[in-house]
Amino acid sequence: MLMGCSSTGTVNADTLKYSSWQFVAKDTGAKHEPIRIEFLDAFRVNGFAGCNRFFGQGEVKEGQLFVTDIGMTRKLCDPDTNEHEQAFLNMLQIGVPLQHSQNELVLLGDSKWHFKLVKGHFD
């Protein structure tokens, strides 16, 4: 049996539950801690958005990830980080198509947001 890197198109909450993902920055000279997202019990979602920690209730519907009831810390960071963080959180709130493979999660917003699996976090 041959297996590729992309999903078969079937992504649901059970596929992502108990997993942790870290944003793979295009710019390797990033000065800030990378964005992280975790999917927990009852599909609660939490993570770090670049400047602030966030949490909310996740749902996967028709191949899109939605996060509602988002709460977050309120630190003020540099304008570029704040803009990147806000774009990420807005994308989660309005819903974003996603692709999933064993070690990669891609959020297909205005641009592709690539995340790699953080191994050992929930093992």
Give the role of each language-model region.
Residues 5-123:
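Lipid interaction determinants
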